[in-house]
Amino acid sequence: MAPRILKHFYMKDKYMFEAYKDNSELPQKVRIEASSKCQLDCVQCYMRLDPEGVEKGCGLGNLKFSDFKKFVDENNFESIEISNHGEIFLNPELEKIIKYAYEKGIELYAGNGVNLNYLPDKIAEALVKYKFGSMDVSIDGASQQT
């Protein structure tokens, strides 16, 4: 019985999405995660527990450009927050993501924070060139112990 119920909800949600996807009253902002990886091991961060055993600390993966492109092309958002728990600058396809959003007129921002421990020059240049919206910078601790 459970698979039938799940199929019902999937079909209902799919129909509702298709019926209203161009409706300007739907949310114009969304948060997706460019990377769930992080090079830090902050004591206060629950992501460091790594329940999946993928890597030490955070580390489930990066948003693929192809997935981002499909998401953007199938929806009508004005802005997208691309930060959540990982460090966005660890995504090797971030420059393409930033450029594509700019070309589509979508503002990107990182309101949930970045740590800036890794910021390649080409990404820093892309942030300026493609008018990245804003970002909050997170300080990982007051000392080595915290």
Residue ranges of predicted features:
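Conserved alpha-helical substructure of the radical SAM core
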Residues: 2-135, 145-146
